[in-house]
Amino acid sequence: MAVVAMSTTQSAKAEKRPSMELPAFRADSALVLVPVNVVDRRGAIVNGLARNAFLLTEDGVEQQIRSFSEEDAPVSMGIVLDLSGSMKRSLGAAKQALRALIEDANPGDEAFLNAVSTRPRAYSGFTRDFDEILHRVAFENAAGSTALIDALYDSLKELRAGVHPRKALLVISDGMDNHSRYTSKELRELAVESDAQIYTIAPGDASAMAPFGKAMALSQQRQGLQFLDELAARTGGIAFVVRDQKELAKAVVSIGHALRNQYTIGYVPHSDGRKAEWRRIKVKVAGSGLRAYARAGYRPD
């Protein structure tokens, strides 16, 4: 399971190129563009790396990198806030984290907010008025069951309407679900076919999530964290597990840094000639303690 420590962004030695509206992910017959985040062993975002620091493979075959850039581009972002009963003791910290995210947003960013408990609820469509988002959740309480999969499914579809090519879904939740109509399989399929990166933040203290028995809470926590981690890994996002309010706020700031310090790697697929419905992408980065986060693959047109 990918558990990332909280830290600040590492300074760039290389100069960034001017901001450009690059696609978050694109795969066609000519070029595949893959967004990549790099973190060090402390969890700090690393920028300023050169093209030759990266190795990319598709279905195990090394690919020649044809284009390479590092851009700070605007983001169309969806936020899903879990307001179910299992988040009751973490709700105050979750609201603080949401505020930290909003305050870290760039002027060109846009975001919508969906909440979830027994059913998904749309709190705000795409807006640049982030104060409106904060106002809508200021007096909300946590209660009820959790239709998390439904909320994520609906939010991924809503993200398609975002004006910016770069798209991300931020999920503040413990990962538990007990009231959804969609299945986890349906959500995974939609996630890998979308062009959005999913970033998740989950409280790591079982006692803060469930008052009805520590053993059951630990078991459900483990399943929820695995579910969130898989969604993040498949889409090139990062899953954060936090244990107190301070770490939660830092996680949101780290996600903001990740969104604004991405590399985009482009390549023309060269494989062994097999016709594959699913093509696996693997990105590695040179450097002690560095790790690259990229989506797990794509389905060719």
PLM-predicted stretches and their roles:
Residues 5-301:
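Scaffold/interface architecture of coatomer-like assemblies
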